[in-house]
Regions:
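Active-site-proximal alpha-helix that buttresses catalytic centers in soluble enzyme cores
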Residues: 1-82, 101-130, 173
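A polyampholytic, Gly/Pro-enriched intrinsically disordered region
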Residues: 96-112, 185-196
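Domain-level recognition of soluble alpha/beta enzyme cores
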Residues: 22-25, 162-192
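Signature for phosphate-centric chemistry
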Residues: 82-97
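Active-site catalytic microenvironments for nucleophilic, acid-base chemistry
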Residues: 70, 74, 135, 157-161
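Generic beta-sheet signal
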Residues: 2-3, 54, 138-148
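Short, solvent-exposed loop/turn segments at secondary-structure junctions
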Residues: 8-11, 62-64, 84-86, 148-151, ...
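Catalytic DNA-binding helix-loop module of base-excision-repair DNA glycosylases/AP lyases
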Residues: 153-155
Length: 196
């Protein structure tokens, strides 16, 4: 089983408008910002929904690592850059301040279109996730503390091969479970016993 957990809330205040350079700086500051302390009730709720034994993975970004440290202080996570949030770079050069939503929206549009301005293009991310599939299959239980857009992208790719739940919106500290196994024997056995 693969369980994805989105990182805790980041303590960062976005401005309403940015120049291209300002937007890039804000993104870098957000990546270094601290996270909110996780409440005891949230810790219990998350931990209670997990298997007893699992392999822990995080991205290489501070918010993912810090969230994992609060959730699982006795575990040392395996950090993989492929699990990091898919960054949004300025979609154009501009000294004129533009609204934050424009930077975010058009940057994602470029990402979906594999525009080279977005350095980690959709094609590159899909290739990274496909390469990680072998790790997913080899491990019995995995927990990944990751990022919202990266998680949604991963779930879309996993859904091509495996039964996964795909929520529309993944809030901070939300959990998503995926049953990742080879379809040949285990999948057919699952279908027969579940009556699907």
């Amino acid at each position: 089983m693969l369980i994805l957990i989105r990182h805790a809330h980041v303590l960062f205040n976005w401005e309403k408008k940015y120049t291209a350079e300002g937007f890039a700086k804000a993104q870098a500051e957000y990546d270094k910002a601290p996270i909110e302390q996780i409440r005891d009730s949230q810790l219990r709720s998350i931990r209670d929904g997990l298997p007893e034994h699992f392999e822990l993975y995080t991205s290489t970004l501070k918010r993912s690592i810090d969230t994992a440290a609060q959730l699982f202080p006795d575990k040392t996570p395996i950090q993989l850059p492929e699990l990091s949030e898919i960054p949004i770079y300025p979609y154009r050069d501009s000294d004129k301040p533009l609204s934050l939503w424009r930077w975010l929206f058009w940057g994602r549009v470029q990402w979906f279109c594999n525009n080279p301005r977005q350095e980690r293009t959709k094609q590159k991310v899909e290739h990274e996730i496909e390469a990680l599939m072998s790790v997913f299959i080899e491990n019995k239980n995995m927990v990944i503390v990751g990022h919202g857009f990266q998680m949604r992208t991963m779930l879309s790719i996993l859904a091509r091969r495996y039964p996964v739940q795909k929520p529309m919106h993944i809030k901070n500290l939300d959990r998503v479970k995926c049953f990742v196994y080879e379809k040949d024997q285990q999948y057919l056995s699952f279908l027969r016993t579940s009556g699907i």
